[in-house]
Amino acid sequence: MSHPLIFPDFDPVAFHIGPLAVRWYALAYMVSFIIALPIARRLNRLAPEVATNEQVDDFLFYAILGVLLGGRLGYVLFYRPMDYLSHPLEIFKTWDGGMSFHGGALGVILALAYFSWKTRLSFLAFADRIVPVVPIGLGLGRCANFVNGELWGRPASPDLPWAMIFPTGGPIPRHPSELYEALTEGVLLLCVMLFAASRPQVRERFGFLSGLFLFGYACARSFCEFFRQPDANIGFLSGGTTMGQLLCIPMALAGMGLMVYAMRRPAQVSAHV
């Protein structure tokens, strides 16, 4: 019988810049954007022409706003609406944690829609050049969740070699579900998206990559939810499902719909509108 691993004693603060404490989650966001931007620029140079690299750079500001505002509001609305209704000022305490990917995704979609309208770009074509790099942020974000010792998994067999005891998870060994999500939503989905984006026949079907991302994320997240402990204030829903799985259903349906729509339309050689 193997002994479960003990969660490492990580400092919740990655480093300090003078009086400013930079936490791991904020660092994950910053590193994600630094890594993702040059890759998105490289993808944008591939045919068919969609946007200029300057437009990709400009969109970064809108993407950051979409992720932060959408992620926070999504967490408030999807996971703890009554708590924040009673204490509305708590919404602004982002340093205490509480972000939702589904909310962040909606925020980025709205940012994409506004930016595409403002710059007269094709919404689906431009989105296809952005979404392949999103798994970078997902993977690093889940790594930050692990370092923070949060969003841990369900109880695991003590014989599981990587079963771990988390400081806030009680004395029982658990699945390190944050790392499962980092590997599936991050590494695996990134490989799938970059491979698909490298195929000219895929890039010419505007909307296909966006649909593939939505469907791929929904599948990866739904799978990992079987190992992740549900939020304590929500618990399990009907049939043993979780809120994360419930929110993935419309995402998967939208993804499949986009892929079918893209494949039924003729291939495009230009994205100018």
UniProtKB/Swiss-Prot annotation:
A 1,2-diacyl-sn-glycero-3-phospho-(1'-sn-glycerol) binds at R142. It holds the Pfam family LGT. InterPro entries: Lgt. This is Phosphatidylglycerol--prolipoprotein diacylglyceryl transferase. GO terms for molecular function: phosphatidylglycerol-prolipoprotein diacylglyceryl transferase activity. It is a multi-pass membrane protein. It is found in: Cell inner membrane. GO terms for cellular component: plasma membrane. It comes from the Bacteria. Its EC number is 2.5.1.145. Coiled coil: none annotated. It comes from Gluconobacter oxydans (strain 621H) (Gluconobacter suboxydans). Belongs to the Lgt family.
